[in-house]
A protein has these predicted regions:
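Short alpha-helix
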Residues: 177-194
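Class I SAM-dependent methyltransferase SAM/SAH-binding core
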Residues: 32, 40-92
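Conserved Class I S-adenosyl-L-methionine
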Residues: 159-181
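Core SAM-dependent methyltransferase catalytic element
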Residues: 195-215
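Class I SAM-dependent methyltransferase Rossmann-like catalytic core
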Residues: 1-28
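Conserved beta-strand signature within the Rossmann-like core of class I S-adenosyl-L-methionine
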Residues: 140-150
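A conserved beta-strand element that flanks and buttresses the S-adenosyl-L-methionine
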Residues: 113
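A short, conserved alpha-helix within the catalytic core of class I
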Residues: 120-133
């Protein structure tokens, strides 16, 4: 077995996320994963949901060989080779043919999935993710699913977990452009491109899984 890059966090959260996905998603479809990282989620979800075709991507070209090796190791017909995709680029994917032309509905995605990206990327990445999702999701029925920590209205959801406050401080120290995002701000960016927050799922370790759909 190949010695592939491994994320302990991805191992911990892959099953709770899968449990949520199986409740949220339709029986079959095609999913685009943004910021696949090690590819652990892509391989796990594709194996558990054989009726869903999974397209992993990453903005870092250095990550693609390891993801490709994981795809090859999984040997699943519904798990595609990874593509280079930077959400800030005007074209998705960043190299090769564009995914979908505006008039080709059959080339759109039924789901776009993005885990643990928004807090380790500059804030404009959020707007770019929302705009790209609006372009590439199947009109009317497609959903954008994001996962990670968010700051919420404490009057509605209670005090912020100390672990999230400490994590945010650590992120800011590593890069001032990083940090846990306010959920209200993320929802506002979605609204600008015609997407609305449909579902909010509380997840382990003070994370949230959010589902956005066309408004």
């Amino acid at each position: 077995m190949l010695n592939l890059p491994h994320s302990p966090a991805a191992d911990r959260n892959k099953q709770p996320i899968l449990d949520a996905l199986t409740r949220i998603l339709d029986e079959r479809g095609t999913a685009l994963e943004i910021a696949s990282g090690t590819g652990q989620h892509a391989a796990w979800f594709a194996a558990a949901m054989p009726s869903w075709t999974w397209q992993p991507t990453d903005a870092d070209a250095r990550s693609l060989p390891a993801i490709a090796s994981r795809v090859e190791q999984a040997a699943l017909p519904n798990l595609r080779p990874p593509l280079l995709l930077d959400v800030m680029a005007p074209q998705w994917p960043s190299q090769g043919p564009a995914f979908a032309q505006e008039d080709k509905e059959e080339e759109k995605f039924d789901a776009i999935y993005c885990a643990n990206m928004l807090h380790i990327a500059p804030w404009p990445t959020c707007a770019a993710l929302m705009a790209g999702a609006a372009r590439h999701l199947r009109a009317g029925t497609g959903v954008l699913i994001t996962y990670g920590p968010y700051f919420e209205d404490e009057a509605q959801h209670g005090p912020t977990a100390p672990s999230n406050l400490a994590f945010n401080e650590d992120l800011r120290a590593r890069d001032p452009a990083w940090g846990i995002r306010r959920l209200d701000d993320v929802v506002a960016e979605a609204r600008r491109v015609g997407l609305a927050l449909r579902e909010r799922h509380a997840m382990p370790a003070n994370n949230l899984l959010l589902v956005f759909g066309f408004s």
